[in-house]
Curated annotation (Swiss-Prot):
NCBIfam families: benzo_1_2_benA. Binds 1 [2Fe-2S] cluster. Binds 1 Fe cation. It comes from the Bacteria. This is Benzoate 1,2-dioxygenase subunit alpha. This dioxygenase system consists of three proteins: the two subunits of the hydroxylase component (BenA and BenB), and an electron transfer component (BenC). The gene is benA. Keywords: 2Fe-2S, Aromatic hydrocarbons catabolism, Dioxygenase, Iron, Iron-sulfur, Metal-binding, NAD, Oxidoreductase. Pathway: Aromatic compound metabolism; benzoate degradation via hydroxylation; catechol from benzoate: step 1/2. Fe cation binds at residues 224, 229, 376. Its cofactor is [2Fe-2S] cluster; Fe cation. [2Fe-2S] cluster binds at residues 95, 97, 115, 118. Pfam families: Rieske, Ring_hydroxyl_A. It catalyses: benzoate + NADH + O2 + H(+) = (1R,6S)-1,6-dihydroxycyclohexa-2,4-diene-1-carboxylate + NAD(+).
Amino acid sequence: MPRIPVINTSHLDRIDELLVDNTETGEFKLHRSVFTDQALFDLEMKYIFEGNWVYLAHESQIPNNNDYYTTYIGRQPILIARNRNGELNAMINACSHRGAQLCRHKRGNKTTYTCPFHGWTFNNSGKLLKVKDPSDAGYSDCFNQDGSHDLKKVARFESYKGFLFGSLNPDVPSLQEFLGETTKIIDMIVGQSDQGLEVLRGVSTYTYEGNWKLTAENGADGYHVSAVHWNYAATTQHRKEKQAGDTIRAMSAGSWGKHGGGSYGFEHGHMLLWTQWGNPEDRPNFPKAAEYTEKFGAAMSKWMIERSRNLCLYPNVYLMDQFGSQIRVLRPISVNKTEVTIYCIAPVGEAPEARARRIRQYEDFFNASGMATPDDLEEFRACQAGYAGIELEWNDMCRGSKHWIYGPDDAANEIGLKPAISGIKTEDEGLYLAQHQYWLKSMKQAIAAEKEFASRQGENA
């Protein structure tokens, strides 16, 4: 029997036609069915969210021995636990007996987990320690042999500088290979402190009525900022004009993109949007400019302090260092519903004044009650509703195509960054093209795998 039922892909034989990438005619567009088709969503969950690397958590969220943290890989509940020796393990958060979730809170500290359903007990490395009422239970000889009834470990589980990723597919390439050039951007965030990063207390989780790709695109959409977030831009500009009232010292949205910026599309669907700040002196880490220059060089220091960065690690997380510093994690619930969870991040050992400013900037722009997030969610809802208008089939992505650069631009060359495509303006849309090219490649591989699986089933019937 198949581990997961075969997905019917018979209507997807012409999937190549869903993405138009024509450099001769200048047409770059995506068919809107990719946001609404149930079979495509099922393939995405199985092959992108469960069959490739996804972000799980940050090590600072499981800091102590015996701490645990719960999350998801696609549809499957995951438990990350630090055992008594300090080792991290990632396991399916389901009892090996009858499948009940073991850990039912987001986080905690336990040396063992006892299933509330039938009382089986596991240690925090996943080993089955005992079952309830074992005497004269009549278990088969094969019961609990060679770890047969231990918790199921996640097939691949790796960390990059504190960021934890997992995959249910044992054959994925190494995490370092998957992240590729984006590690240089991650290093900019982590390098702000010799002690690394930490996730601060507090979390905001919300859902919106729309496909997951809407937020995957939007976090690197520089074109929407002045339209959707005009109220925030006006508010921060008003504060700047009345300096006495600007206790938050928010980063200037009114000057977004006016001092330079751009975007990059990388292999494996990753993206980066960046801008040159109009007021870098209000960044929490601005006092460390000389230290960064000495440690990393002038070019890297400039990128770390004077430039905002929205980094999408495809498919499910943004690392943002801009109006606030945050980790934004998306989780598809259904083809037209998505959950988003955001955390404020900061360098370990940050000065109290800088930490307070960082938190206030984060609260100002983000959170479900911030001045920006609700605006984005309304546009996601409106887009998903608009996709029902199937007579208008395409999303256009040609903005900036006349000046896209295939490969690195001058700003990327400053730090040896090697993107697949560079947009020289923040409003350019070529980075979406790179992301959707990877999506299409993944979907074609998924369809081929499903057809092969269906064929083998037919032979064995």
